């Protein structure tokens, strides 16, 4: 595992998280989501089912991303 997920975050099954990505407090990455390398998901971010996030993306606190 070459990425960081804070212990308060929840990662569903069938999720890809790229190398060097950081997922901070109280995030939820839902089934089928794909997050590229060297990304940062701020506190309380929700990545919905099947969403694709590219490389080097920063998503700030309290943001939800839907397909």
PLM region spans:
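Left-handed beta-helix
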Residues: 6-7, 12-13, 18-19, 24-25, ...
């Amino acid at each position: 595992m070459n990425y960081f997920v804070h212990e308060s975050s929840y990662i569903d099954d069938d999720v890809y998280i790229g190398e060097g990505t950081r997922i901070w407090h109280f995030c939820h990455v839902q089934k089928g989501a794909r997050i590229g390398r060297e990304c940062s998901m701020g506190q309380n971010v929700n990545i919905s089912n099947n969403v694709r996030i590219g490389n080097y993306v920063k998503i700030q606190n309290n943001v939800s991303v839907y397909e």
